[in-house]
């Protein structure tokens, strides 16, 4: 025993860790017996002191941290900014959730770190502080919830609740916080029960993996080691952890300080030597670990190191595997008991913040940092090496060292305030981040109509549903409007865009029956004023419209209907608009019209020269029966070389169109039946039948006449020709008339009779046999191309001839060639003539290289009417076509109040008047999800708001002469819809600037010259591409659009040169909130521009949702969504929430290699990379070996660090060597690839790395394998003992496979011997289970065998090599299962 005088007096607080150190030093110094005597005295002293001080714990001892107030305030400010960005549509829901969690988690962690210094400064003898930080009871997490903040909670599904609990348990929780807190508490109670059983099972699995590992030798002879240094590349290792890693290990290399050797190889490290090495500043120390041991199934004393029980080198025969398994599994049961106290508090892995200690200036070396952005897109600096940051205030200079790969969030020489975040330390990259794929559903906040601002594609697995994939980042908009379902009957009364009174809105989405029409606006459009009395009747009186419907000529009075434009029902397919014409009778009976103008855009949206732009099928040229088309002697030129596809009810046929040069053609009717080959035909060829004769079992003839049967490939054509049969006398006269058309008056001359024909006839010679023939005279339907609707008047030619040289030519096409038969498909009618508009542009222009133009439909709502524009995008040229026009010259003037169903504004005072009451709205028809009933969307005044009036906007009155120079086009006599486009010379798209201030959308528009500035006419509309349309209801004069430029011009006007800032407000444009439309104040709400007037804009309220690529959009474009409907689904990766409660599952996930994306994928990538590079450099055998070795070494170190981190976070100390033994077992296998070794191993077989290496050497051929990471369960089922595997899991399967393969169990492990009742090969039974034989003796045996079976030497070489290697290694290493 040492003398009392030599003892050192330590005056410091002794916590749990210090007591551990004290005990270990006492054992080293005095031995076990004396140490126990000392510890008894310490225990007695402790009880005496506790009794004397009588420490008690009261609620007043829970001291809240003073900095909590401003920390929470700071976090709330950041959350508020984030919420604003989300509201503006700059941040999508998943980003918002992630950032919100990070903000609150960082706040909570900082509070937790502040806790200990706060107690130490204010009240070091606080009972809570003494109790928790000494390790007696409770840990930092629990105290943090008592005096810090409870923080973020997980819900029962493990998802984060993004509303943090800001209070702590000392302050008390609000009602909302209490309910959220109950989630976590319930989760904690359930977890406790489940986890206790899990912990026991984890211990069992761990022991299964390593039960056979026993210390069998003193030294395996390895020369490898693992280098440990206190300053690692990725992180700073604390001195305590460094000492703990080194103590009890054995050195792999000599250590030199200068030229002096201070420690030699195979020396074990004690506390004195470790302290000496640290103080001498040794950079790295190479130590032996279980990873470096050369065996796979056992371990040597030097690689294991000291025994943790008595501090000497471990004894031979020690079952270190079972000790390791229990050391890791046992704290698991401890951890599960702790979960009860803390509940489901989130402790995820996010970045730590470095805050400035006081106000001052920041200084750092700018050459060592690089500008970058954080993961949230904020600008920052990235440092690659340790960076010293100095904070200078008036009298203090404070220095902080920022570790590598961290973000600096402030600039050099910037003034920072106290506690401002100056840097963000990222977690070390050496650990694996556990990630899982999560679906986040975004639900609609309000009812309305869905729009999106980009193209979407159908999700492949939902081709026939309404789920779409977004290809790029874009906004989804929900345009406001309340909907009411309806039956189809209501649509006989209500038309799109009508105003109506709504007595009540049904919240339950029932259909509303008591709707009445307010047809004031409608009557101004197309009805007489006396219609007001008949409002309630529901069927308008169309008597005012003059129309005669002749039965013979089909003379529709198109102009009346076209001008009045009462009900244009646009049937819109994906790329076609049908604009129908209705006869008066059809309108009265609400028939669906049979004909109309179809504007068709090719599916790819590209027009080429001479493309057909629109066509009109006149019902006069429509036939129900089949027949033959004849032009007679008239000419028709095929002007379209490329055959055009025409769609007939889904059946596509190629038709060539022929341009009519003349105004007459003939149709010869015939009845045609196409029958299958096997049909029974009941009539004979060339026989004559009457009407309604049975042709086959189920087909009867509709006309009488001559039967003609033609048998073709796999089908029979049966034709019936109606007409008169004549038997002529002279052949030569008839042959001239065979198959030709005869005009009226020409007679058929016979010897006995002469007959005059009133109509055209078709004479056809028929020859049933070679000698017999007769002539069939068939009736002919004569068609004359009368002036049908003139499509050219829809698009006045003058408009397009000015600058862009667009020509729209009208052609009548006959759809069938001369003499070609026409066939109807399943009782559809056949269109003979089609009136087409062909689009062409001038080839002499300098833009003649333009071979194709893009076209698309633009839907714009203005003045309460939906209009469809077609955009054709030439270079600097547009033509437009408006579907609805309600102010045609014949319909009288419409007052602005009736045109605008939303508001009227008094121009003098600029006072806002709402002309819409709350129960007064506008109907729009929409798709609905359930297709049985359509639904109405009602826009009421609450859904719209007005911007303006813009009093500061001034217009320039320029001299009238310049207007005179520009030709004016009157549209008094032109009938039909008309749109005129004004081209803006330089148009820049708008980009909102992401700032927290007001955002001003300002454009710089340069005018071509001063002549182009004109007085702005009262009302105009701008479509979404910046073109401005003059829609003055009081004016029948349209300014020539290609000589004018219209602008919103602000005040500054220079006399000669005009470059103005102007705000372009496009109709249909979407605005996010907080954009400045006017200069004075930002726009208060987001929405879509609905009406543009001279000094104000009406905007329909809308809410933007930002969505990222790959998000799934539920629903169709313009579909009505109700509040709470699923709008979009995000799929994103999130770090698995590491609850305090989830320490154990994390360990299990690492050991079972269960994480979806992290460990396995990282390992796979690493392996592929190494294998590719190294195989290419070193050749195949070495490449595979070194690639696998490097992969295994890296993954082993990563796994050990990960497991240690989990346990250390819970305050549990486990020696690295225990974890290393487990990890060595789950990383020691390689997977045989399919390419090679088919003669020894099967592809997909798991073998040890050493065995693969040795077998490859013996076989002298390339082995293809790669490292694989097994979980502990798989490793337990892939050992060399089938008895051990069968006693663990799947007993029948394991035994059956072992029997089929003829496996041998060498009974090397403990478990196999226990099962069979033998002596276990550990401890005292260590030497009894081994068979010793000399190397020389075995070699002689093998040689004898080889001589005896020399005949088979060539065939069996592979097996002998394998056996020789097997026996050599087993005898030399005293282990049969080495390979």
UniProtKB/Swiss-Prot annotation:
InterPro entries: DNA-dir_RpoC2_beta_pp, RNA_pol_beta''_euk, RNA_pol_Rpb1_3_sf, RNA_pol_Rpb1_4, RNA_pol_Rpb1_5, Rpb1_funnel_sf. Binds 1 Zn(2+) ion per subunit. GO terms for cellular component: chloroplast; DNA-directed RNA polymerase complex; mitochondrion. The keyword Nucleotidyltransferase applies. Keywords: Chloroplast, DNA-directed RNA polymerase, Metal-binding, Nucleotidyltransferase, Plastid, Transcription, Transferase, Zinc. It is found in: Plastid, Chloroplast. Zn(2+) binds at residues 220, 293, 300, 303. It catalyses: RNA(n) + a ribonucleoside 5'-triphosphate = RNA(n+1) + diphosphate. NCBIfam families: rpoC2_cyan (TIGR02388). DNA-dependent RNA polymerase catalyzes the transcription of DNA into RNA using the four ribonucleoside triphosphates as substrates. This is DNA-directed RNA polymerase subunit beta''. The gene is rpoC2.
């Amino acid at each position: 025993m040492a003398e009392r005088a030599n003892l050192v007096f330590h005056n410091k607080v002794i916590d749990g860790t210090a007591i551990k150190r004290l005990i270990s030093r006492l054992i080293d110094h005095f031995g076990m017996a004396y140490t126990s005597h000392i510890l008894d005295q310490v225990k007695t002293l402790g009880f005496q002191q506790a009794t004397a001080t009588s420490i008690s714990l009261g609620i007043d001892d829970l001291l809240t941290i003073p900095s909590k107030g401003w920390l929470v305030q700071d976090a709330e400010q950041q959350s508020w900014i984030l919420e604003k960005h989300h509201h503006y549509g700059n941040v999508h829901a998943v980003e918002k959730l992630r950032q919100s969690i990070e903000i609150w988690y960082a706040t909570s962690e900082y509070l937790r770190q502040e806790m200990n210094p706060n107690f130490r400064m204010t009240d070091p003898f606080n009972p809570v502080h003494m109790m928790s930080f000494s390790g007696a009871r409770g840990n930092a997490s629990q105290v943090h919830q008592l005096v810090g903040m409870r923080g973020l909670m997980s819900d029962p599904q493990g998802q984060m609740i993004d509303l943090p609990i800001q209070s702590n348990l000392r302050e008390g929780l609000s009602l909302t916080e209490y309910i959220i807190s109950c989630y976590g508490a319930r989760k904690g109670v359930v977890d406790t029960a489940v986890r206790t059983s899990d912990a026991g099972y984890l211990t069992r699995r761990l022991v299964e993996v390593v039960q056979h590992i026993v210390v069998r030798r003193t030294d395996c002879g390895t020369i490898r080691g693992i280098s440990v240094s206190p300053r690692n590349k990725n992180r700073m290792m604390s001195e305590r952890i460094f000492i703990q890693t080194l103590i009890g290990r054995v050195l792999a290399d000599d250590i030199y300080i200068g030229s002096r050797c201070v420690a030699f190889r195979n020396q074990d490290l004690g506390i004195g030597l470790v302290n000496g090495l640290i103080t001498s500043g040794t950079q790295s120390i190479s130590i032996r670990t279980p990873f470096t041991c050369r065996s796979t199934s056992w371990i040597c004393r030097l690689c294991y190191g000291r025994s943790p029980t008595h501090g000497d080198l471990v004894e031979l025969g020690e079952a270190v595997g079972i000790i390791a398994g229990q050391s890791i599994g046992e704290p698991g049961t401890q951890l599960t008991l702790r979960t009860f106290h803390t509940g489901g508090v989130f402790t995820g892995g996010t970045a730590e913040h470095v805050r400035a200690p006081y106000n001052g200036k920041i200084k750092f070396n700018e050459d060592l940092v690089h500008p970058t952005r954080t993961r949230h897109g904020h600008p920052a600096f990235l440092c690659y090496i340790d960076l010293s940051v100095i904070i200078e205030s008036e009298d203090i200079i404070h220095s902080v060292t920022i570790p590598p790969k961290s973000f600096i969030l402030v600039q050099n020489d910037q003034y920072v305030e106290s506690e401002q975040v100056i840097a963000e330390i990222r977690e070390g990259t050496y650990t694996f981040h556990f990630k899982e794929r999560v679906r986040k559903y975004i639900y609609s906040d309000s009812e309305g109509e869905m729009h999106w601002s980009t193209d979407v594609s159908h999700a492949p697995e939902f081709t026939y549903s309404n789920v779409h994939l977004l290809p790029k980042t874009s906004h989804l908009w929900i345009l406001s409007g309340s909907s009411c379902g309806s039956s189809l009957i209501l649509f006989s009364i209500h038309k799109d865009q009508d105003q109506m009174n709504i007595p009540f809105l049904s919240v339950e989405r029932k259909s509303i029956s008591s709707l009445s029409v307010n047809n004031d606006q409608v009557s101004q459009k197309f009805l007489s004023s006396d219609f007001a009395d008949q409002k309630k009747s529901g069927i308008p009186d169309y008597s005012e419209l003059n129309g005669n419907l002749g039965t013979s000529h089909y003379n529709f009075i198109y102009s009346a209907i076209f001008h009045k434009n009462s009900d244009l029902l646009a049937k819109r397919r994906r790329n076609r608009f049908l604009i129908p014409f209705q006869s008066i009778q059809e309108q009265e009976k609400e028939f669906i019209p049979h004909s109309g103008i179809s504007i068709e855009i090719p599916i790819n949206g590209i027009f080429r020269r001479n493309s057909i732009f629109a066509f009109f099928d006149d019902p006069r040229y429509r036939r129900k029966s089949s027949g033959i088309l004849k032009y007679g002697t008239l000419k028709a030129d095929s002007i379209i070389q490329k055959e055009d596809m025409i769609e007939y009810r889904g059946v596509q046929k190629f038709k060539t169109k022929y341009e009519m040069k003349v105004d007459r053609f003939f149709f010869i009717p015939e009845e045609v039946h196409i029958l299958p080959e096997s049909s029974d035909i009941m009539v004979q060829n060339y026989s004559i039948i009457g009407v309604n004769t049975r042709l086959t079992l189920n087909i009867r003839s509709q006309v009488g006449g001559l039967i003609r049967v033609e048998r073709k490939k796999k089908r029979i054509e049966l034709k019936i020709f109606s007409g008169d049969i004549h038997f002529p006398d002279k052949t030569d006269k008839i042959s001239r008339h065979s198959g030709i058309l005869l005009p009226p008056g020409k007679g058929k001359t016979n010897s006995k009779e002469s007959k005059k024909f009133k109509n055209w006839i078709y004479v056809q010679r028929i020859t049933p046999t070679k000698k017999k023939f007769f002539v069939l005279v068939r009736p002919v339907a004569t068609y004359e191309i009368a002036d049908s609707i003139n499509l050219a008047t829809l698009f006045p030619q003058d408009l397009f001839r000015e600058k862009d040289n667009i020509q729209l030519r009208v052609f009548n096409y006959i759809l069938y060639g001369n003499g070609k038969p026409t066939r109807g498909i399943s009782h559809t009618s056949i269109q003979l003539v089609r009136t087409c508009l062909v689009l062409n542009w001038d080839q002499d222009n300098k833009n003649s290289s333009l071979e194709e133009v893009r076209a698309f439909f633009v839907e714009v709502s203005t003045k309460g009417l939906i209009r469809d524009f077609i955009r054709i995008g030439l270079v600097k040229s547009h033509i437009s076509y408006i579907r609805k026009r309600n102010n045609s010259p014949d319909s009288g003037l419409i007052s602005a109040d009736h045109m605008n169903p939303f508001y009227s504004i008094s121009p003098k005072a600029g006072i806002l008047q709402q002309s819409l009451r709350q129960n007064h709205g506008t109907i729009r028809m929409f798709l609905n999800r359930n297709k049985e009933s359509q639904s109405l969307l009602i826009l009421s005044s609450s859904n719209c708001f007005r911007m303006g009036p813009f009093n500061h906007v001034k217009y320039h009155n320029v001299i009238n002469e310049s207007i005179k120079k520009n030709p004016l086009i009157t549209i008094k006599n032109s009938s039909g819809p008309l749109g005129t486009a004004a081209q803006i010379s330089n148009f820049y798209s708008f980009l909102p600037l992401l700032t927290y201030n007001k955002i001003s959308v300002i454009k710089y528009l340069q005018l071509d010259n001063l002549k182009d500035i004109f007085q702005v006419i009262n009302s105009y509309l701008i479509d979404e591409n910046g073109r401005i349309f003059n829609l003055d209801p009081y004016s029948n004069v349209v300014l020539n659009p290609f000589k004018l430029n219209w602008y919103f011009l602000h005040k500054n006007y220079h006399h000669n040169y005009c470059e103005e800032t102007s705000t372009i407000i496009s109709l249909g444009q979407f605005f996010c909130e907080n954009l400045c439309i006017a200069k004075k104040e930002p726009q208060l709400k987001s929405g879509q521009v609905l009406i543009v007037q001279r000094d104000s804009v009406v905007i329909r309220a809308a809410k933007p949702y930002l969505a990222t690529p790959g998000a799934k959009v539920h629903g169709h474009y313009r579909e009505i969504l109700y509040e709470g409907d699923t709008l979009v689904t995000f799929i994103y990766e999130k770090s698995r929430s590491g609850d305090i409660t989830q320490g154990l599952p994390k360990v299990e996930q690492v050991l079972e290699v269960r994480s979806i994306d992290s460990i396995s994928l990282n390992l796979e990538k690493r392996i592929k990379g190494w294998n590719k590079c190294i195989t290419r450099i070193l050749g195949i055998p070495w490449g595979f070996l070194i690639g696998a070795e490097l992969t295994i070494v890296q993954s082993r170190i990563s796994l050990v660090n990960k497991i240690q981190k989990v346990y250390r976070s819970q305050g549990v100390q486990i020696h690295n060597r225990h974890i290393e033994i487990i990890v060595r077992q789950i990383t020691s296998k390689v997977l045989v690839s399919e390419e090679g070794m088919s003669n020894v191993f099967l592809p997909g077989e798991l073998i040890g790395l050493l065995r693969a290496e040795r077998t490859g050497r013996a076989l002298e051929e390339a082995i293809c394998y790669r490292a694989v990471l097994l979980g502990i369960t798989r490793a337990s089922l892939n050992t060399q003992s089938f008895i051990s595997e069968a006693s663990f899991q799947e007993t029948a399967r394991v035994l059956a496979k072992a029997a089929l393969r003829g496996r041998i169990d060498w009974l090397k492990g403990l478990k196999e011997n226990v099962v069979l009742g033998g002596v276990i090969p550990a401890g005292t039974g260590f030497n009894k289970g081994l068979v010793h034989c000399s190397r020389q003796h075995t070699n002689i045996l093998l040689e004898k065998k080889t001589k005896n079976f020399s005949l088979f030497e060539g065939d069996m070489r592979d097996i002998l090599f394998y056996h020789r290697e097997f026996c050599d290694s087993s005898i030399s290493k005293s282990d049969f299962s080495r390979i």
